[in-house]
């Protein structure tokens, strides 16, 4: 195993914690949930502590977000950020149930490596 991507604490370098968020769209709101998630990308791109972020579609009305952070502080900043605030404002209109937000710990990961400029 290449241990260069593993930190001293045994977790993947650069990533130690994450969030898995499940979103169930109200009937007829599926497209709006998709649009909301796509529009969230620029907001997340402005968060330096969000190492990776994915908007997901599990099925016709089932969506999610998976994101990872270097540490708990980065995760807390994200949870207090603009995407979380926007989701809080729109959840009652867009979602059939409250979002399920599950904190997760990263056991292993493969992230893109920075390439040297030629």
Regions found by a protein language model. Give the residues of each.
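Generic anion/oxyanion-binding catalytic loop in active/binding sites
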Residues: 22, 42, 64
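Active-site-flanking beta-strand signature of metal-NTP-handling nucleotidyl enzymes
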Residues: 16-24
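An amphipathic, aromatic/His-enriched active-site/gating alpha helix that lines ligand/cofactor pockets
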Residues: 39-52, 68-102
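Short, surface-exposed ligand-recognition loops at beta-strand->loop->(often short) alpha-helix junctions
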Residues: 23-34
């Amino acid at each position: 195993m290449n241990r260069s991507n593993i930190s001293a604490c045994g977790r993947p370098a650069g990533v130690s914690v994450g969030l898995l968020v499940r979103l169930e769209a109200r009937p007829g709101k599926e497209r709006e949930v998709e649009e909301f998630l796509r529009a969230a990308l620029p907001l997340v791109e402005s968060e330096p502590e969000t190492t990776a972020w994915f908007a997901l579609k599990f099925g016709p009305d089932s969506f999610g977000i998976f994101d990872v952070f270097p540490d708990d502080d980065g995760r807390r900043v994200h949870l207090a950020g603009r995407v979380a605030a926007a989701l809080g404002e729109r959840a009652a209109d867009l979602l059939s149930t409250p979002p399920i937000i599950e904190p997760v710990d990263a056991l292993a990961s493969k992230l893109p490596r920075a390439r040297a400029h030629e």
